[in-house]
């Protein structure tokens, strides 16, 4: 007979009874550190510091197993409280009394209260605002298996299709959905001649028999009038064959529904014609902006995403038998002081697309339009007015409501939430990066960060957006729920506190079926393998040669490579703390063997002008210090940010020509677009294990994982690769080919676009026919936004032109 599972408290108590002395000594050691918050590596270090005999006795105990799952410890004598992550998304909280060796289970508010006591005990006597979104999602089905995280639409379709389609009466929401379907006043799918499910089945069979006698390529216009008389309108397909496929799918659903058929059917229904994409911050333009402050991977992502989406929308609309022109608007900020960019133009056509445009709307206050760039951390006072202005501008451009609104990053997702709520439109959220995970303890010590980063506004906006949206897409599983040992970006918002501000008891559930993993790719017109000689941009080679090897030092490049025949270790990113470009320079500088084997080329920061970004200024100062301290000139080249994407693509390929490698050393990377770009060009890649690259790369097969917190080991791994390539040249080719194979299987914009548009349709359908519109939570969020977010945003100083 199976034994019942022991609770967390019982597991601790069983260890206390068998190892009382050893546990007392260990916990006393932790307590002696004084009151405070300890991270997992500190707990591990303290355990390693106890006597070897005690360590051996405890190694297999439940205490150590649970300590290995602890993400944090709060020492508040005589108690030690632990936040234990049993698996991704599943947490429990306990506290241990060091003197009495007793254990108590804690609720989330109890645990957060103890944490607040350490930081701001004086505020705990007052009423504390608690945020708890759990009651609003209680009726929404959720999976329980870790493998289901990020596969929300599959779970939702399985669960709700089984529930909805139990009998013919429960089919009415689907019938109503098809009958109410329209675009710009034009009825699609079914007209009012179809009143019942039985009636729908009858005409599907009649029409199916008629279609079976026609040539498969017969255009819909040939039988449009006949079908209209029995209840069908346009939208089923452009030819007899496509219409017949749709009819058969719907008949199958009405007879014996299954999740796969339902998703395929919904993906083919014409639902998305107009899309609005929000990305307010930075310098959003198509040329000469990459490397500007707050302007990097997100801009590239959207400019690659939009042409691919437009192509997929155009293809679907044609196959649906419609003559509607799809429109995509990328809404960003208009910058009157455009600094040599097109950011002062209201409307700009997107390269590679026919009907997609960048629509720019300025930030304004009562005093007028803000002219200059401001940091993404300072945008909060402008967002609500910006939203109102955006609503007017998109109405002017589209002459209709959008069918899907996609937000990007914190402020883009907040604006998307406000717009979607105002217009009643399906909303998609893409975080790219949630700052709370990039800056450790930025929640508990928010007041220390707030003057510089205004995280109180940003974290509040993030909570509003992730709970308001209909669906969230992420590039990786790690973005949602981390890994066995690390907490995911969204998962870190499950429970946290900002003392004196509010306490989040239940912020988000990573098992929520709104989460879906949809990985992007690289623009294959720009990024393609170095081996495709006929496509190579040889006309650019002289200037790339000059960029890498010229003996001239100026504001575009400093330091000279003396041995131009060595392989190049290459990295390219924004110059900020998290991207850690100075980290890779330091690893290289301190490893004589690596310096002997390869040259290091870093592209990042803009030395051609004075940076207004404080982080970039600090990183530049550090870079100059490393160059001087380690005498890197001769083996190292520092190039200012390169804004020409086409040339950057050829630059990757030229690095591959040297049999070099790409390294991405970030402390955390939500996805890793440069990793995709480098691998698409055939460049062997070393990338951080913290975040998305851990999923993109299969270690040792399509690249290598490195830990930026252990730079010496990372440098040794790179040394080992290049040493092996010297003795076994085919090893370089093997890793290069492995990277290309990985990209082609999983990371292309075509796969991405197909998935995103299907998700938009499926969630739009479920929102219409079930309670997934989450009305209750949206009313709660309106109040939270008005009473808390607005005050926080108003406390952020307005910029001065």
UniProtKB/Swiss-Prot annotation:
Function: Sucrose-cleaving enzyme that provides UDP-glucose and fructose for various metabolic pathways.
Tissue: Exclusively expressed in flowers.
E.C. number: 2.4.1.13
Top-level taxon of the source organism: Eukaryota
Protein name stated in the entry: Sucrose synthase isoform 2
Chain spans, region GT-B glycosyltransferase: 271-748
GO process terms (BP): sucrose metabolic process
Reaction equation(s) it catalyzes: an NDP-alpha-D-glucose + D-fructose = a ribonucleoside 5'-diphosphate + sucrose + H(+)
Subunit-level organization: Homotetramer.
A Pfam family annotated for this UniProt entry: SUS_EPBD
The family this protein is said to belong to: Belongs to the glycosyltransferase 1 family. Plant sucrose synthase subfamily.
SUPFAM superfamilies, per the entry: UDP-Glycosyltransferase/glycogen phosphorylase (SSF53756)
GO molecular function: sucrose synthase activity
Lineage of source species: Eukaryota, Viridiplantae, Streptophyta, Embryophyta, Tracheophyta
Keyword annotations from UniProtKB, A to Z: Glycosyltransferase, Transferase
Keyword presence, Transferase: yes
Matches recorded under InterPro entries: Glyco_trans_1, Sucrose_synth_GT-B1, Sucrose_synthase_pln/cyn, SUS_EPBD, SUS_N
């Amino acid at each position: 007979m199976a034994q019942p599972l022991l609770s967390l408290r019982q597991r601790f108590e069983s260890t206390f009874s068998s190892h009382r002395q050893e546990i007392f000594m260990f916990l006393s050691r932790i307590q002696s550190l004084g009151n405070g918050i300890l991270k997992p590596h500190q707990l591990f270090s303290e355990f390693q510091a106890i006597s070897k005999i005690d360590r051996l006795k405890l190694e297999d105990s439940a205490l150590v197993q649970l300590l290995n799952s602890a993400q944090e410890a709060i020492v508040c004598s005589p108690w030690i409280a632990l936040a234990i992550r049993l698996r991704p998304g599943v947490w429990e909280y306990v506290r241990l009394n060091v003197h009495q060796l007793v254990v108590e289970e804690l609720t989330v508010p109890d645990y957060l209260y103890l944490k607040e006591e350490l930081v701001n005990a004086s505020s705990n006597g007052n009423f504390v605002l608690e945020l708890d979104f759990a009651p609003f999602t209680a009726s929404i089905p959720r999976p329980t298996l870790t493998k289901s995280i990020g596969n929300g639409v599959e779970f939702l379709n399985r669960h709700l299709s089984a529930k909805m389609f139990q009998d013919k009466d429960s089919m009415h929401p689907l019938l109503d959905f098809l009958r109410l379907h329209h675009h710009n006043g034009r009825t699609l799918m079914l007209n009012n001649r179809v009143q019942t499910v039985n009636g729908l089945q009858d005409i599907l069979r009649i029409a199916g028999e008629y279609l079976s006698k026609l040539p498969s390529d017969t255009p819909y216009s040939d039988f449009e009038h006949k079908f209209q008389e029995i209840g069908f309108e346009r939208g089923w397909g452009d030819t007899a064959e496509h219409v017949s496929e749709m009819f058969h799918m719907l008949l199958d659903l009405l007879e014996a529904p299954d999740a796969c058929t339902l998703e395929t059917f919904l993906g083919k229904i014409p639902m998305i014609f107009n899309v609005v994409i929000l990305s307010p911050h930075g310098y959003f333009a198509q040329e000469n902006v990459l490397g500007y402050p707050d302007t990097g991977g997100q801009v590239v992502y959207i400019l690659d995403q939009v042409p691919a989406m437009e192509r997929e929308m155009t293809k679907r609309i044609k196959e649906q038998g419609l003559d509607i022109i799809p429109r995509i608007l990328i809404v960003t900020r208009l910058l009157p002081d455009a600094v040599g960019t097109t950011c002062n133009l209201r409307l700009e056509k997107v390269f590679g697309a026919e009907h997609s445009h960048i629509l720019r709307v300025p930030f304004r206050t009562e005093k007028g339009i803000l002219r200059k760039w401001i940091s993404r951390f300072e945008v909060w006072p402008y967002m609500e007015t910006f939203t109102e202005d955006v609503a007017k501008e998109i109405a002017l451009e589209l002459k209709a409501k959008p069918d899907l609104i996609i937000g990007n990053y914190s402020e883009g997702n907040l604006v998307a939430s406000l717009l979607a709520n105002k217009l009643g439109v399906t909303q998609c959220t893409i975080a790219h990066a949630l700052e709370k995970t990039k800056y450790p303890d930025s929640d508990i010590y928010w007041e220390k960060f707030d003057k510089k980063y205004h995280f109180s506004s940003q974290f509040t906006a993030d909570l509003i957006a992730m709970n308001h949206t209909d669906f969230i897409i992420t590039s990786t599983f790690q973005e949602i729920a981390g890994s066995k040992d690390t907490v995911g970006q969204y998962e870190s918002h499950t429970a946290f506190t900002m003392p004196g501000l509010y306490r989040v008891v239940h912020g988000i559930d990573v098992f929520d079926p709104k989460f879906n993993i949809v990985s992007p790719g690289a623009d294959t017109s720009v990024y393609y393998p170095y081996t495709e000689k006929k496509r190579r941009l040889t006309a650019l080679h002289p200037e790339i040669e000059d960029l890498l090897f010229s003996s001239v030092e100026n504001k575009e490049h400093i330091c000279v490579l003396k041995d131009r025949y060595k392989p190049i270790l290459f990295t390219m990113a924004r110059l900020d703390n998290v991207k850690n470009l100075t980290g890779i320079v330091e690893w290289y500088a301190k490893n004589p063997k690596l310096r002997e084997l390869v040259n290091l080329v870093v592209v990042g920061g803009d030395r051609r002008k004075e940076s207004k970004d404080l982080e970039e200024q600090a990183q530049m100062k550090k870079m100059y210090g490393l160059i001087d301290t380690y005498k890197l000139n001769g083996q190292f080249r520092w190039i200012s940010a390169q804004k020409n994407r086409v040339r950057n693509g050829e630059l990757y390929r030229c690095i591959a020509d040297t049999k070099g490698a790409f390294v991405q050393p970030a402390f955390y990377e939500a996805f890793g677009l440069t990793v995709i770009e480098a691998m698409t060009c055939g460049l062997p890649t070393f990338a951080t294990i913290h975040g998305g690259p851990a999923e993109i790369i299969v270690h040792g097969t399509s690249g290598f994982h490195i830990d930026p917190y252990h730079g010496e080991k990372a440098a040794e791994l790179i040394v080992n690769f290049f040493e092996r390539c010297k003795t076994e040249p085919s090893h370089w080719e093997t890793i290069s080919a492995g990277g290309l194979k990985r990209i082609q299987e999983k990371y292309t914009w075509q796969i991405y676009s197909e998935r995103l548009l299907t998700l938009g349709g499926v969630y739009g359908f479920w929102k219409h026919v079930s309670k997934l519109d989450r009305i209750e939570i949206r009313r709660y969020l309106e109040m939270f936004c008005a009473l808390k977010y607005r005050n926080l945003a108003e406390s952020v100083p307005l910029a001065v032109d």
